[in-house]
Amino acid sequence: MRWLWPLAVSLAVVLAVGPSEVSGAATLSLGGHRAKVQEQQSRPRRGTKDEGPKEVQHYVPEEWAEYPKPIHPAGLQPTKPLVATSPNPDKDGATSESGQELRTNLTGTPSQRLQIQNPLYPVTESSYSAYAVMLLALVVFAVGIVGNLSVMCIVWHSYYLKSAWNSILASLALWDFLVLFFCLPIVIFNEITKQRLLGDVSCRAVPFMEVSSLGVTTFSLCALGIDRFHVATSTLPKVRPIERCQSILAKLAVIWVGSMMLAVPELLLWQLAQEPTPTMGTVDSCIMKPSADLPESLYSLVMTYQNARMWWYFGCYFCLPILFTVTCQLVTWRVRGPPGRKPECRAGRHEQCESQLNSTVVGLTVVYAFCTLPENICNIVVAYLSTELTRQTLDLLGLINQFSTFFKGAITPVLLLCICRPLGQAFLDCCCCCCCEECGGASDSSATVSADSKLKAEVSSSIYFHKPRESPPLLPLGTPC
């Protein structure tokens, strides 16, 4: 009966402790991890009674974190109202008694913290320049888009204007249209907001398109100058045979492919750079810096192009078309003699058309030189005096550089419509048809028919359309394209 004594002692202890502890002891004896967690949670916290002064050592995950201190750019504004992140702001020193506003927590993704700067509103000192740039850009954009579209549509839809000469002018208008439509909004948006649309892609594509447009203009002027020289020195009759569509496309392909091949280094030269500023946050800018990931041979070629870019730009895209045009005009004047003298094989209307075409080439060259001269001057100044100029001056020179290209694309079609009589007459007829479509009558229709017949007579006798009125029997019949 000795084994009954330990059992009796155990029962007495259990009765003295209580039934709640019995259930806890039974669960603990089963060895469950869940019982241990519940027992730890049911225990009173350490220091609740005897360790009251150690309460400041408690770790609360929701407390305000002072370090690392977030960056507060001056131009940024929080997207949400100021809310205290600490559960007890009075302990953190951000009480209402101090009179200071609560600081916001700027931790998060950059897209949530950064905002696009809008200098247009509220109106400040920089708003006037932003409005001036936008107004100038809108005028250039509207004039250039309407003018270039008009030239392309007139050449495309008119049977009497489909020639190699007018096709070159239409391709010139197409490239100017692309530059104005795609590059102008990106440049103006970057100038106003200091943020770059499409990022690194636009930094490479915009210079490529602008240089390609300059190349198309350069080679087009050279081709037109060669054509004038060929006409002046040719012994063929004044009326030339029809030029097939394949020949026209081949000439345009040479101009386009050559221009884009010369502009390929621009894709490897430019890249996007982001600079933090104390007033405007992060500012996007495009810099000439080849990527270090390029192969060694290609990297050396791009660096060589960067070092020689200024003089290559000046020689190929400025001096070449001007020298070509001046030389061809001097040779043409030398062959034809003084203006009062008329060659035996050319007289009357044909001589007038020849002088008109020469005036067109000279006018295009003068406009091109006038628009590209500021760009070349800015390139030379930046290349030799960039270390002595401020950042604002460099930005202004870059803006002038861009706008000179946009001015060229907007003025060129206006000049073509004013100098070239067939293009200008077709544009006026199109405008009159659009404006007076509902008020037409018998007299108006007869006037329109007479105007059309007059235009056809003028154009068919000019060099713009190579098909003669009475073609030789050996020439194939059909349209030029």
Curated annotation (Swiss-Prot):
It holds the Pfam family 7tm_1. Residues 30-55, 76-107 are annotated as: Disordered. One of its GO terms (biological process) is negative regulation of smoothened signaling pathway. GO terms for molecular function: G protein-coupled peptide receptor activity; G protein-coupled receptor activity; peptide binding; prosaposin receptor activity. Undergoes metalloprotease-mediated cleavage which reduces its constitutive activity. It is found in: Cell membrane; Cell projection, Cilium membrane. Residues 95-107 have a biased composition (Polar residues). The N-terminal region is required for constitutive signal transduction. Interacts with the PTCH1 receptor. This is G-protein coupled receptor 37-like 1.
